[in-house]
């Protein structure tokens, strides 16, 4: 299916690995010219080259920067003053006891997971409204709806993503611009693979059974009882980025494998 994304310019933050990289690949597969972002220039260049080889008819570019830093964002804006699609994927997480979270850590999570995406949306939204097309997508988490006690500082910011996206969608009324949030469930990224290795490397469970054991014992509410693959999130995000996804805005979209037990 042609999603109508050919030659659309898409900025995907935090796109050198994991879900962000998968989103960038699927957008490029649909013909979009993606801007790859990450903090390490070598990692950014590597992904740009990979996508160029995979999809030679597209024009991927790199924007190495820590977009939690305001000066880095200003440099990005000078280099890329307009985009058609903004995917705010960049974020940090860290399991921590509530009692051990310092004020500085709360501030850091808010700055990285909320304010960076807010600043990008504030800059790029006016052009989208002017051209009467645009997509802003926040990548949140099922933790936005089902906060755990393992990392409250992370859960809080993901819930804030939902609220922010809903508020921004009010500014697009009557236009072809949409603002939505996607909430992935537990996904087999490089970080999760490393977590599984750390959890099970001393156990008697065979590596090929780690995933099933993890889902059974740590994600029992999942209806699919497997980890979601990054490319599944990527394909869904590509659709939400497309002109075909024009009938909803301000939505909190679940791609969680049925992990969240509520209807609404």
Name each model feature, range by range.
Residues 173, 178, 248-250:
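Short, small/polar-rich loop/turn modules that mediate ligand/substrate recognition or access, typified
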Residues 146, 238, 249-264:
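Short C-terminal tail/terminal secondary-structure segment
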Residues 97-98, 105-110, 218:
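Substrate-binding pocket helix/loop in short-chain dehydrogenase/reductase
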Residues 121, 157, 165:
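Active-site helix of classical SDR
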Residues 141:
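Residue(s) in the substrate-gating loop at a strand-loop-helix junction
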Residues 9, 16-17:
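Conserved glycine-rich cofactor-binding loop
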Residues 126, 170-171, 246:
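Alpha-helical segment proximal to the catalytic Tyr-Lys
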